[in-house]
């Protein structure tokens, strides 16, 4: 399943596309995927996930969340309602924020090289201040799976 953000920004849309692509690449149907839309904050995702659980909506056995905040909020809601993570439902996040290391169970996540991204963005800004570029620049960076205990 996918815990997608209720905010419609490019990063989250790209993660949704990546989720669907991975589902198809593993021979599964995206039509059968369980997708829940949650607020992209711990508190918002917690509240939204409680509503989903309490409504009786079917839950997936595993979820990829658009960010770690959503994953952490969902884990807290699942645990409050008696689910065991990862035994009943596994969850992986994206961003590798520090809160993911201290939640129980520690969150499996995708790490992004934030320092490199910041340095690259600053260098690009300086270049554009010196010589304006009439088009946007998109730079893709590699990510790393950080295996912890939520999967």
Residue ranges and their predicted role:
Residues 1-151:
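Bacterial carbohydrate/catabolite-sensing allosteric modules
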